[in-house]
């Protein structure tokens, strides 16, 4: 049976190799230190959280955290990780795999049969979710341990979170709470007659319908269903498109998760042949990268920090390795690895050419 407790032993399981190395404690010593730090406050139900806000994100700890408080805030982070894990395990919720969704979309777009697509963007997703409804659902179902629900309650009683709306963007618990809020909406749309593919990555939704009627009906129904969750559609970023429309003009493309999908007819021996799917980075993403490059050059004029400029350009346009905190092994990152499903390099090279 899954253990929902917040003992030092359970929280130690959630530490990374980097954290174990940085604090220089062997396993039993680490577990004892965690228990010494938080067990009394948890037992007496007096534990309190401290958060800061940076660029609209709620983060663990205070902006003036002192070196000797590092372990205190590590323990707070471990508690947040345990709350996240408890919700994820008990309610079987998890965020979708972005790369897997893109791969599936490529297969569907490349099929020979007709399809009708709805692509939706939910406006201010985290900030608009009804936190009261989500928390009441957790409190009334008694599936989480009493301590887990109490700690959740204490998180939302922290003044800077209490004064905000929705789910706090940036905290580890936010993704599982939002997935829980959307769980039955996702199931209902997946099971709707005529839908043969549905995916949602946070606030981005895509639906493949077998008929135009299904597409039109859902286009009207979904805003009503989202309204029940206190959510609204960002109509300027939402779109209906059919396989026929994708083929009619080069200007027609499907933009989703930072990718641009388009169908182009190949010409062989002077005659039109098969339709080929092209997958690139979307123009919007490329433009955003170019804007950040421009700001980086403007910034170096002000501060003269060429080294910082070099790092920023590498981050924006190149590929690099970072250490996985869990395993300490190098992990590939960068623009190519963020968009590994592209099959044309014309837009991928565009930021470098811009420099």
Predicted segment positions?
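Alpha-helix N-cap recognition
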Residues: 97-100, 211
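Conserved short beta-strand edge segments in small beta-sheet-based binding/regulatory domains
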Residues: 230-238
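Glycine- and acidic
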Residues: 64-68, 120, 163-171, 202-204, ...
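Conserved pre-motif C helix in the palm subdomain of viral-like polymerases
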Residues: 57-92, 164-190
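Hydrophobic, Leu/Ile/Phe/Ala-enriched alpha-helical segments that form helix-helix packing faces
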Residues: 34, 38, 42, 86-87, ...
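Right-hand nucleic-acid polymerase module
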Residues: 1-47, 51, 72-81, 85-96, ...
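Reverse-transcriptase-like RNA-dependent polymerase core
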Residues: 37-61, 147-159
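Conserved polymerase palm-domain catalytic core
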Residues: 109-202, 206-225, 253
């Amino acid at each position: 049976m899954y253990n929902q407790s917040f003992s030092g032993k359970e929280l130690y399981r959630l530490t990374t190799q980097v954290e174990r190395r940085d604090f220089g404690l062997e396993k039993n010593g680490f577990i004892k230190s965690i228990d010494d730090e938080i067990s009394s406050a948890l037992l007496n139900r007096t534990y309190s959280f401290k958060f800061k806000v940076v660029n609209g994100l709620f983060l663990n700890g205070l902006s003036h955290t002192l070196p000797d408080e590092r372990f205190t805030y590590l323990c707070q982070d471990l508690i947040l990780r345990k709350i996240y894990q408890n919700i994820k395990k008990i309610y079987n919720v998890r965020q979708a795999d972005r790369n897997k969704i893109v791969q599936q979309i490529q297969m569907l777009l490349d099929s020979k049969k007709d399809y009708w697509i709805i692509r939706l963007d939910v406006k201010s997703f985290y900030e608009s979710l009804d936190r009261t409804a989500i928390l009441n659902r957790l409190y009334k179902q008694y599936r989480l341990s009493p301590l887990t629900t109490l700690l959740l309650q204490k998180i939302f009683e922290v003044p800077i979170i209490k004064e905000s709306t929705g789910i706090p963007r940036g905290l580890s618990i936010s993704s599982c709470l939002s997935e829980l809020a959307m769980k039955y909406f996702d199931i209902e749309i997946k099971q709707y007659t005529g839908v043969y593919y549905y995916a949602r990555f946070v606030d981005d939704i895509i639906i493949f319908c077998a008929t135009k009627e299904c597409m039109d009906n859902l286009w009207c129904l979904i805003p009503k269903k989202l309204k029940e969750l206190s959510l609204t559609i960002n109509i300027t970023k939402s779109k209906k498109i059919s396989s026929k429309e994708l083929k009619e003009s080069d200007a027609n493309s499907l933009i989703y998760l930072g990718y641009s999908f388009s169908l182009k007819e190949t010409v062989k021996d002077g005659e039109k042949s098969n339709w080929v799917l092209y997958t690139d980075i979307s123009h919007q993403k490329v433009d955003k990268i170019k804007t950040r490059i421009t700001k980086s050059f403007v910034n170096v004029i002000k501060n003269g920090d060429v080294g910082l400029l070099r790092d920023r350009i590498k981050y924006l346009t190149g590929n690099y390795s970072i250490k996985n905190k869990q395993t300490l092994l190098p992990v590939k990152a960068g623009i190519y690895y963020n968009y590994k499903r592209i099959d044309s390099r014309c837009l991928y090279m565009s930021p470098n050419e811009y420099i």
